Amino acid sequence: MSSIPAPAATIVMEACGSAHYWGREFQQLGHQVVLLPPQRVRPYVRGNKTDRTDATGMLEAYRNAEIRPVPVKSVAQQTLAALHRLRSGWLAQRTAQLNSVRGLLREFGIVIPVGAPHVVPRVRALLEDADSGIPDALRNTLADVCTDLRTLEGRITQVERQLEALAQQLPTVARLRSIPGVGLLTATALVAVVGDARRFPSGRHFASYVGLTPREYSSGATRRLGRISKRGDAYLRMLLIHGARTTLWHAKHRKEPDSLRSWAVRVEKLRGHNKAAVALANKVARIVWAVWTRENTFTAIAHAA
């Protein structure tokens, strides 16, 4: 790093593994760092893959004003992202083991009810019953699996506690959690992925960044809007849509009248549940931008409107 020119330089890199760390290091030395999305750089790399062609491709991509750089993430953002990634991995492991146990026991005529809370207590009760029909050779192994499942559940709970503790230090998270359908996971994921919503000129641009706006197919006087683009971070989009589904369910079953929920229920009656959930997620993304940029809560903004 000492070989980087002393006068402030512009350093262009692909936003790949460890790029954010090096970006922070270079910024501390007074340099301007530009991280480019690898998928946007690839079309500019011609011929064989060498350091020279990679560098040439990155420079050509950097000169294209239509390619938006990736902001350098802070340590706090990467910490939140790492906790979310660990939680997602443990959730996937738990789901795989739960399904495996239910499938194995079904082969012996034992049906475990659907739902994570039912599996471990039910399996342990069966293991204590000598006449349950579980082969003796499987009993110790299934007991170990139950222990593993409890361990995974403990890790998931611990990560969520860590996220809650970090959220207490971030005023932005508290404001975002005032929005319907945005809880701890979604709010902290937004901070981890986006960093600062003020880099987007409008809520519509922010919703497009998350991939919740429709694709456009235009030719001449013909203009058709298709399915959502699904650009951007798939995990963040999933959280927003799941939160919208929960909000929609509450609006229908718990009668929580307000303009946002009433609008979502009307859309569901016209277009169906899935489209209504995605439409609500799109609207929530725009509200997220408004709450974030105005540094106010959803309730205060709604009353001001």
Regions found by a protein language model. Name each.
Residues M1-D131, P214, L248:
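Phosphate- and other anionic-substrate recognition elements at nucleic-acid/protein interfaces
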Residues A221, K252, S259-A305:
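Low-complexity, acidic/Ser/Thr- and charged residue-rich accessory regions of DNA metabolism proteins
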Residues A61-Y62, L80, L142, L190, ...:
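Short alpha-helical scaffolding segments that buttress acidic/His motifs in well-ordered protein cores
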Residues K73-A76, G109, P113-P117, R139-C146, ...:
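Conserved phosphate/pyrophosphate-binding and hydrolysis machinery centered on Walker-type P-loop NTPases
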Residues A65-R68, Q97-L98, I156-V159, G195-R199, ...:
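Short helix-capping/linker segments at secondary-structure and domain boundaries
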Residues H84-R175, K255, T297:
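Glycine-rich, often acidic, oxyanion-interacting loops/wings at catalytic, nucleic-acid
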Residues Y44, R175-L184, A189-H273:
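Phosphate-backbone recognition surface of nucleic-acid-processing proteins
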